[in-house]
Amino acid sequence: MREIISIHIGQAGIQVGNACWELYCLEHGIEPDGTMPSDTSVGVAHDAFNTFFSETGSGKHVPRAIFVDLEPTVIDEVRTGSYRQLFHPEQLISGKEDAANNFARGHYTVGKEIVDLCLDRVRKLADNCTGLQGFLVFNAVGGGTGSGLGSLLLERLSVDYGKKSKLGFTIYPSPQVSTAVVEPYNSVLSTHSLLEHTDVAVLLDNEAIYDICRRSLDIERPTYTNLNRLISQIISSLTTSLRFDGAINVDVTEFQTNLVPYPRIHFMLSSYAPVISAEKAYHEQLSVPEITNAVFEPSSMMAKCDPRHGKYMACCLMYRGDVVPKDVNAAVATIKTKRTVQFVDWCPTGFKCGINYQPPSVVPGGDLAKVQRAVCMISNNTAVAEVFSRIDHKFDLMYAKRAFVHWYVGEGMEEGEFSEAREDLAALEKDYEEVGAEGADDEGDEGDDY
């Protein structure tokens, strides 16, 4: 089996996790208590969904996941929520004091105490797998737990499971909306280790998703639940090929191979279509070409950055539902002729497509309409650098005055770590610039390998 372990860290990671597991359960017909009426082969672990769920002897399906937070309130909601019987109590790990929006607390002081317990639980999950394929890590980098403990866990996973791939779903601070003053510090410090310790990181930002909810779903004041349900659709689409037997399957390691041209250039944009409310769905024809065009629209991107300002290096299209390869090929051919979708000149093909015949499910009473077919795109575009330069700029404004730095130093960090992380990000911006530059002939020494 090719199992995947999901790790949800901090408030954002846990709440996105709730939305994801709710959706997975719906898709597989698993009840909130973990039973699966349709599963005839009880105890046989050969079904495709066993990549995400482990099956107990009594026929209960338990998510291969852990939820970690440094303070209990958010995890207590899981412990008392409608899916409380789905998880083993040991999978929900909470501390007593939170990271107070401070990377250093999450990474050094408070996080240190809980990280061994987390790794212990991960080890138990891993021992339960026959062929662990990798980890999905969910966190936000603006707060303290997601950024600090998130980085710490990623670093430790690299040590313990060096060869396994790690996919991050990372919520980045939005340009306008902010939940903490020190977001730029936490993000820069955390990205420093995301660079090293994740193989693919999908960037999400709340503001972009708010806008999609407002515009496409007519929700005037979107809540986190609305946002997370949209995010969970993306994550579900990415993982359908692992959880169902499909037509053209896309494996986690395949993502890496097809999306990451150079190890550091692994920050992805994602988009999903059709995002449409039930009232509108009746009146629109959502054909394969239409939804394919929609995912390339700048307004569909789940992070605030404009793909037209950059060039695509690669993109992965995951279709699900009533889709045949012929339609996909036609739609992709049309996209290639568009001038707005520009590829770097050293990567002319750039499309990886997957199709899964399982139609998209929606949460009953949710905002999204039930549709016949949907597509999710994960793309590697040089415009992602906009996200970093925005955060770097805010970081510089504060760091020039050393504002708030004493809180970090007081928790055992050294000032040098700030400048080290900041330099790493400056180098990353530069990397993106070079990758998107016209022609690769200015790097003469690299062309001689052929």
From Swiss-Prot:
Question: Which gene is the coding source of this polypeptide chain?
Answer: TUBA6
Where does this protein come from, organism-wise?
A: Zea mays (Maize)
PANTHER family from the UniProt entry? TUBULIN
Report the function annotation for this chain: Tubulin is the major constituent of microtubules, a cylinder consisting of laterally associated linear protofilaments composed of alpha- and beta-tubulin heterodimers. Microtubules grow by the addition of GTP-tubulin dimers to the microtubule end, where a stabilizing cap forms. Below the cap, tubulin dimers are in GDP-bound state, owing to GTPase activity of alpha-tubulin.
Its cofactor is: Mg(2+)
Give site residues, Involved in polymerization.
450
Q: Where in the cell is it found?
A: Cytoplasm, Cytoskeleton
Superkingdom as given in the UniProt entry: Eukaryota
| Annotated PROSITE patterns | TUBULIN
Which terms does the record give in the GO molecular function aspect?
GTP binding; hydrolase activity; metal ion binding; structural constituent of cytoskeleton
Q: How does it assemble?
A: Dimer of alpha and beta chains. A typical microtubule is a hollow water-filled tube with an outer diameter of 25 nm and an inner diameter of 15 nM. Alpha-beta heterodimers associate head-to-tail to form protofilaments running lengthwise along the microtubule wall with the beta-tubulin subunit facing the microtubule plus end conferring a structural polarity. Microtubules usually have 13 protofilaments but different protofilament numbers can be found in some organisms and specialized cells.
Quote the Pfam families the UniProt record gives: Tubulin (PF00091), Tubulin_C (PF03953)
- Listed binding positions for Mg(2+) are 71
Q: Which EC number(s) does UniProt give? A: 3.6.5.-
* InterPro entries per UniProt: Alpha_tubulin, Beta-tubulin_BS, Tub_FtsZ_C, Tubulin, Tubulin/FtsZ-like_C, Tubulin/FtsZ_2-layer-sand-dom, Tubulin/FtsZ_GTPase_sf, Tubulin_C
Its lineage opens with:
Eukaryota, Viridiplantae, Streptophyta, Embryophyta, Tracheophyta
Q: What is this protein called?
A: Tubulin alpha-6 chain
